[in-house]
Curated annotation (Swiss-Prot):
Converts the circular intermediates produced by the viral replication and carrying a joined telomere site to a linear DNA molecule with covalently closed hairpin ends. The viral circular DNA is cleaved at a palindromic site called telRL thereby generating a linear prophage plasmid with telomeres. Binds covalently to the 3'-phosphoryl of the cleaved strands. The lineage of its organism: Viruses, Duplodnaviria, Heunggongvirae, Uroviricota, Caudoviricetes. This is Protelomerase. Residues 535-575 are annotated as: Disordered. Its EC number is 3.1.22.-. One of its GO terms (biological process) is viral DNA genome replication. The gene is tel.
Length: 617
């Protein structure tokens, strides 16, 4: 029997709920939790009866398995360990100096508990270092006050406690509290917060080691296969999008995706931060105060920090407000999540927007290998080249600190994977060209006198005036015979004749199928067409799976799985490329062969169906 991943997770949740509500002893419940998790992992990855010999071909990779486990654990993130309340009470009584802070962890939602616990651990860790400093002070004297003021700056979370040193002139009480805090820190590291099943929904040590080795190899490959990006071309293309008139964007995710991409490229923020969670306030022309960073397990973090903007900060704020004013974006902010949904709210939203945003990235770079998240690494590289050596803020920091703080990484090692892009033709004084010129409109005006003779009456003149009006409102407007026919209710042959006559002026060529396509694609921003940072192909491709693709993945959960069962061949489609409003380029692989199709279609689904029909029938 084959079932979808989403149903597999729902079944796991149902089983855990039944165990939790039963009147079994807690030890028996824990064993059953572990058994349910083991059954889930066997179905997805670990069953040796299915996944051996030829069956290994059907098994997902370690990277995907890790992602699936994470998705399964997310269904239990708002549940706490059964012993958590009792453990909190015990710890509170054992460490009276911190009793109130510890009690504050109880009776809170699980995500708040994790945030508060992390803050407390950070506070106590700084206290370990402070204890060493206090021990060297000796008897508190007026001359010691300067040292205490200095310590308050170094350890701001202990400022109130340090103030008592001056008033009491005795460090004994604070020393005792800090010593108690050191013991508490050890106790908190042993505290079980998560529900029992979450500890069982993890990889085996051998699989974790293999996954780490694979990630290390991928990072090693990336660092030796730098991708060169044309800096002027990148900045100019970003600027062109941000200066498009409002009318150039329709109220749909597909139409707004290039604008969201450009804003992410200018700020280095994640897609969810641009669309929903991020709060931005311009400090000066090139610095923005940012808060609302998306976090794993921590939902959205509070507080703000300063980031650079690659464009004028005020322009960034204006275009962001324009983007978020559209109903297609507002709907994401007010999305209702089904009660049985096993994804987090941010994951559900990412599932809606991932494909159009990644499509926008491929069109922007003119490179099918590029994806939306590349903007963060490129942004970090540009910011480094522009400000690291010139901004006094980084005078005493190395580049690892720069990348870590700019990208908002808690772990400084995380930024190691964000250095695979190299800027070509970089010049810190280079500025993009912002022009009001409208060359296509000017070229069309040169053809005004041709229109009366192109068709009977004033039909061609009316078409011509309408097209010029569209270009006057939006110089980048895409003009097709389909649009002309739809808006002016004219004959197909007349619309096609007009497009053929004005093709040069419009910057298009008419193909053998009668469809208009751009005269030439803009150059790829990846200057070395052989540059490829996609080693560990399996890992990279699977990281870009959409949530819907994960949900629809089928697993065989029957007891008599056979090595001889062979999966039915299915086509694997690359990201569709939109040539114009109704023209598509579709590429796919089937049975080991590559196929492509280009033509008109009402939607991307229609285009994919036509591509399949033309190549297979």
């Amino acid at each position: 029997m084959k079932i979808h991943f989403r149903d597999l997770v729902s079944g796991l949740v149902k089983e855990i709920d039944e165990i939790e509500k039963s009147d079994r002893a807690q030890g028996d419940k824990t064993r059953r939790y572990q058994g349910a998790a083991r059954k889930f992992k066997n179905a997805v990855f670990m069953d040796k009866r299915k996944y051996r010999g030829n069956g290994m071909k059907n098994r997902i990779s370690l990277t995907t398995f890790n992602k699936y486990l994470s998705r399964a654990r997310s269904r239990f993130e708002e549940r706490l360990h059964h012993s958590f309340p009792q453990s909190i009470a015990t710890i509170s009584n054992k460490y009276p100096a911190f009793s109130e802070i510890i009690k504050d962890l109880d009776n809170r939602p699980a995500h708040e508990v994790r945030i508060k616990l992390k803050e407390l651990i950070t506070h106590l860790e700084s206290g370990v270092n402070l204890l060493e400093k206090i021990g060297s002070l000796g008897k508190i004297k007026p001359s010691t006050a300067k040292k205490i003021v200095s310590l308050k700056k170094m350890y701001p979370s202990w400022a109130n406690d340090l103030d008592t040193l001056i008033s009491t002139e005795d460090a004994t009480e604070l020393q005792q509290k800090l010593e108690q805090g050191t013991d508490l820190l050890n106790a908190l590291h042993s505290l079980k917060v998560n529900h029992e099943v979450m500890y069982a929904l993890t990889m085996q040590p051998s699989d974790r080691a293999a996954l780490k080795a694979r990630h290390d190899a991928a990072l090693h490959f990336k660092k030796r296969n730098i991708v060169p990006i044309d800096y002027p071309g990148y900045m100019q293309r970003m600027t062109d999008i941000l200066h498009l008139p409002d009318i150039a964007f329709e109220d749909s995710m597909a139409s707004l995706a290039p604008l969201a991409f450009a804003l992410a490229a200018a700020s280095g923020r994640r897609q969810i931060e641009i669309l929903i969670t991020g709060e931005f306030d311009a400090k000066n022309k090139s610095i923005i105060k940012f808060s609302g960073q998306a976090k794993k397990r921590m939902a959205v973090s509070g507080g703000h920090y300063e980031i650079y903007s690659l464009i004028d900060s005020e322009l960034f704020i204006q275009r962001l407000e324009f983007l978020r004013s559209h109903s297609s974006i507002l709907r994401l902010q007010n999305l209702e999540i089904a009660h049985d949904e096993h994804r987090t709210e941010l994951s559900v939203i990412n599932g809606f927007v991932a494909k159009p945003l990644n499509d926008a990235a491929k069109q922007f770079f003119v490179d099918d290998r590029r994806v939306f998240k590349d903007t963060r690494a490129i942004y970090a590289r540009i910011a480094y080249e522009k400000w690291f050596r010139t901004d006094p803020r980084w005078a005493k920091c190395d580049e690892d600190v720069f990348f870590s703080e700019l990208l908002g990484h808690d772990d400084p090692d995380t930024q190691l994977a964000y250095k695979q892009f190299k800027l070509v033709n970089f010049n810190p004084k280079w500025t993009p060209n912002i022009s009001d010129e409208n060359p296509r409109l000017a070229a069309l005006q040169e053809l005004d006198n041709d229109m009366p003779g192109l068709a009977r009456g004033d039909a061609a003149v009316r078409i011509h005036e309408w097209v010029k009006e569209q270009l006057a409102q939006n110089p980048a407007a895409k003009i097709t015979a389909y649009q002309i026919k739809k808006n002016l209710n004219c004959r197909n042959d007349l619309a096609s004749r007009y497009m053929a006559w004005c093709a040069d002026a419009l910057g298009v060529v008419i193909g053998d199928d009668g469809q208009a396509r751009p005269e030439e694609l803009p150059p790829s921003l990846v200057l070395d067409i052989n540059a490829d940072d996609t080693d560990a192909e399996e890992d990279e491709i699977e990281e870009d799976f959409t949530d819907e693709e994960i949900d629809d993945t089928e697993f065989d959960v029957s007891d008599n799985a056979s090595d001889e069962d062979k999966p039915e061949d299915k086509p694997r489609f690359a990201a569709p490329i939109r040539r114009s409003e109704d023209s598509w380029l579709i590429k796919f692989e089937f049975a080991g062969k590559q196929y492509s199709w280009e033509g008109n279609a009402e939607s991307v689904i229609d285009a994919m169906k036509q591509a399949w029909t033309e190549n297979m029938e």
